[in-house]
From Swiss-Prot:
Keywords noted in UniProt: Ribonucleoprotein, Ribosomal protein, RNA-binding, rRNA-binding, tRNA-binding
GO molecular-function terms, A-Z: rRNA binding; structural constituent of ribosome; tRNA binding
GO biological process, one term: translation
Ribonucleoprotein keyword on record: yes
Family under the similarity heading: Belongs to the universal ribosomal protein uL16 family.
SUPFAM superfamilies: Ribosomal protein L16p/L10e
The protein's role, per its UniProt record: Binds 23S rRNA and is also seen to make contacts with the A and possibly P site tRNAs.
Gene (UniProt): rplP
InterPro entries associated with the record: Ribosomal_uL16, Ribosomal_uL16_bact-type, Ribosomal_uL16_CS, Ribosomal_uL16_dom, Ribosomal_uL16_sf
Assembly and oligomerization: Part of the 50S ribosomal subunit.
HAMAP family: Ribosomal_uL16
Name of the featured protein: Large ribosomal subunit protein uL16
Entry annotated with the keyword Ribosomal protein: yes
Species assigned in the record: Clostridium acetobutylicum (strain ATCC 824 / DSM 792 / JCM 1419 / IAM 19013 / LMG 5710 / NBRC 13948 / NRRL B-527 / VKM B-1787 / 2291 / W)
One cellular component (GO) term of this entry: cytosolic large ribosomal subunit
Length: 147
């Protein structure tokens, strides 16, 4: 399960997710990727489940890059606890994802294999995603090797 080794602040505020992703929205390493089309918190368990689904489908072939990292702690109070008495303890970690963010990248597989692997992975994620290729970014005129 992904989580930071150490953090500056143990508890953080929730914040809000406005606008589109300005970083991590291009394919940097692979040839194929899935891109978020809506905003959400993605937990480390969901990232791991998607990674396992991709690796099961492509077996030993292909190389996978996980482009998001859960660096935000989410706190919870114990069940049946009265209001007040401070903020709860950190329970799990999430990655804040905005529309346009590239979640996973893949190379050394055919487009059909990548499309199916990412379809299986997208069922494990709480957001809608779209399949993109390096060619899509080159046609838009954007730099595909940002990052």
């Amino acid at each position: 399960m992904l989580m930071p080794k150490r953090v500056k602040h143990r508890k953080v505020q929730r914040g809000r997710m406005k606008g589109k992703a300005t970083r991590g929205n291009f394919i940097a390493y692979g040839d194929f990727a899935i891109q978020a089309t809506e905003c959400a918190w993605i937990t480390s368990n969901q990232i791991e489940a998607a990674r396992i689904a991709i690796n099961r489908y492509v077996k030993r072939g292909g190389k996978l890059w996980i482009k998001i990292f859960p660096d935000k702690p989410v706190t919870q109070k114990p069940a049946e606890t009265r209001m007040g008495s401070g903020k709860g303890s950190p329970e799990y970690w999430v990655a804040v994802v905005k529309p346009g963010r590239v979640l996973f990248e893949m190379s050394d597989v055919t487009e059909e294999q990548a499309r199916e692997a990412f379809r299986l992975a997208s069922h494990k994620l709480p957001i809608k995603t779209k399949f993109v290729t390096r060619k899509d970014f080159e046609e838009m005129g954007g730099e595909a090797n940002e990052g």
